[in-house]
């Protein structure tokens, strides 16, 4: 927990129990691309009494401080992941909401070449590729209205 205290202070944030608990949940291995609602449910499951409004507020503070990265994937729901040192892109299933992170040097090179050809010095970018799971039919158990809920890492 000392590392989390240091990380919060380094980001210019006061160390509070809600911030520490939310950071702790975000560090769990299965909690990549988690929504505020799913994070809140996980805290409740852990017996923590942190309100949903506090979860939203802390996630916004973490986003502003660079601790988390906010993604707005198809479906309109913001999801958060701890900010990583290495750049990666995302594949997203439109049916079940599964998110796959990947890196491809040839794609990165091509994007820089295109930007340069148009006189742009690339400083950052996001690449989201949307499709449907190729193996099996994830739609049998996931309807479009529940795809994000069913993709929760807290199932």
UniProtKB/Swiss-Prot annotation:
Q: Report residues binding Zn(2+).
A: 33, 81, 90, 93, 96, 101
Disulfide bridge partners, by residue number: none
One GO molecular function term of this record is: transcription cis-regulatory region binding
Q: Where does Fe cation bind?
A: 87, 89, 108, 125
Q: Where in the cell is it found?
A: Cytoplasm
Q: Which Gene3D superfamilies match?
A: 3.30.1490.190, Winged helix-like DNA-binding domain superfamily/Winged helix DNA-binding domain
Which GO BP terms, alphabetically? Answer: negative regulation of DNA-templated transcription; negative regulation of siderophore biosynthetic process
Q: Which domain of life is it from?
A: Bacteria
Which stretches of sequence are listed as region Dimerization?
85-155
Q: Which UniProt keywords apply?
A: Cytoplasm, DNA-binding, Iron, Metal-binding, Repressor, Transcription, Transcription regulation, Zinc
**SUPFAM superfamilies from the entry?**
Winged helix' DNA-binding domain
What Pfam families would the database entry show?
A: FUR
Q: Where are the transmembrane segments?
A: none
**Sequence segments annotated as region (DNA-binding):** 1-84
Q: How does it assemble?
A: Homodimer.
Family that this chain belongs to: Belongs to the Fur family.
Q: This chain belongs to which protein, by name?
A: Ferric uptake regulation protein
């Amino acid at each position: 927990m000392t590392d989390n205290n240091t990380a919060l202070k380094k980001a210019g944030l006061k160390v509070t129990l809600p911030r520490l608990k939310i950071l702790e949940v975000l560090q769990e291995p299965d909690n990549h691309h988690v929504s505020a609602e799913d994070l809140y449910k996980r805290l409740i499951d852990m017996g923590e009494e942190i309100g949903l409004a506090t979860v939203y507020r802390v996630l916004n503070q973490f986003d502003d401080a660079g601790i988390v990265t906010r993604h707005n994937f198809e479906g309109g729901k913001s999801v958060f992941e701890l900010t990583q040192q290495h750049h990666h892109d995302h594949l997203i299933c439109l049916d079940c909401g599964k998110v796959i992170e990947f890196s491809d040097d040839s794609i990165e090179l091509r994007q820089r070449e295109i930007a340069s050809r148009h006189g742009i010095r690339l400083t950052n970018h996001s690449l989201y590729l949307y499709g449907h799971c190729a193996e099996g039919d994830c739609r049998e158990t996931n309807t479009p209205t529940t795809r994000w809920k069913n993709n929760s890492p807290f199932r």
